Amino acid sequence: MAYATADDVVTLWAKEPEPEVMALIERRLEQVERMIRRRIPDLDARVSSDIFRADLIDIEADAVLRLVRNPEGYLSETDGAYTYQLQADLSQGKLVILDEEWTTLGVNRLSRMSTLVPNIVMPT
């Protein structure tokens, strides 16, 4: 069970969602919790800190809210003379924890870049 609740997401959203959206929020909170546990296996031990717990709840709620606000991942929509555009950070359409949120949770970014230095031995 996620540390954040559907009420945390609704509070950040500042509007009352429909019942089917509440079910989506609950499901996505479970998913975001699993995402975090894969990167932080000792999550339950870290939550003993009140500051870490508050950050975790905020991050889980924010990640789910980004998705619930724009579940289809649209960037813009036009209907006749009316155009509606969302912020680019809301347009992914999938559950994502941002790099700065991982840093807040104490997880360093995964860097896959490396440098290869050749060791050339010249024939004598």
From Swiss-Prot:
It comes from the Viruses. The gene is 19. This is Gene 19 protein.
